[in-house]
Amino acid sequence: MPHQNEPKSSRLLVIGVVSFYLVAALAMVVANKKVLNETTTPLFFLFCQLFIAVILFLASDALRLLPDRLTFDINTCKGLVPMVSLNVVGLSLSNYTLAHVDASFYQVARGLVLPFTVVATLVFLHSTPSVRIILACSLVTAGFFVGVFLDGVRPSMVGVAFGVASSLITAIHSVVIKKSLAVVNGSALMLSWYTNLLSAIVLIPIFILVGEVPGIMKLLVGEFTAVDGTSPLQIFLWGSLITGCLGFLMSIASLLSIKVTSPITHMISSAVRGVAASMLGKWCFGDIITSGRASSIGIILLGSAYYTWVKHQESQSGAKSSEAPQASSRDGRGSYERVKMDELDLEAARKGTKPE
């Protein structure tokens, strides 16, 4: 009987994890955009999100809710400097991107994450992509240019520039994460803890240096101009709380998602998320979705879905080709140890075309 219930439980677990990621990702974009429309302090907003996530990590650790106890080691911090630096820059650029473009255009502005990631793996890891992978990247790139240059409504080129820069940093970050996991002995939980904590600390001098202090003071003690009965401070606080909590929960759920989801489920959820984000942008913020913008999003999703399918096929082929060496190992004619899928492929399969 337990064996009969196991497949049903597994299906429910997959549905639960995928649904959570879908809802959380959409809520993050909408909440971020709502706050960024009302504030001139995007870096302080990012700091508040990370600070709330850190508090939740500490509370969960105190209540023994995490599988591992949280630690703090200076040598570990030093080893994570490259990743934390890229994380801070990438998240900051993502917020600036969302502040300058419509929510429905955000996915297009950051549409070059996948092509940049493939190029980064070629440059830094010397991993040559297959022809089909190059074709998938070409589709995504074409979708980006359709949205930027062939749409009837011209987007903010400042926002597009931030989006391209953010995509490049995200791509390099996905390469660096492999070495960073080794620093924390392969623990995704510890990596998330250190990343949130150190990123929050690093952001403090940054938002001071870029001149956000006057905006922060105005937000905290200035005159309140109510918008639909809600003040900018209330919007900021609620937005920080919602996105901070969701960011923490997504960090925890990522431990589970790697185990229970497949590239195919990711492909489907990414497509649904892309369409839903556009619809929410139109509904919540009155975004204009032209035929050019819709075509751009569709092409990017098609290229991303094709990439995910190709990576799945290539991993399956690699698994089949390993059967012969494994057989020879059983016969005593040699040894073979099957290698796990590269962390980079897992990260790319999970994120697709990031927006944090």
Regions found by a protein language model. Name each.
Residues M1-E356:
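Polytopic endomembrane small-metabolite transporters, centered on the Drug/Metabolite Transporter
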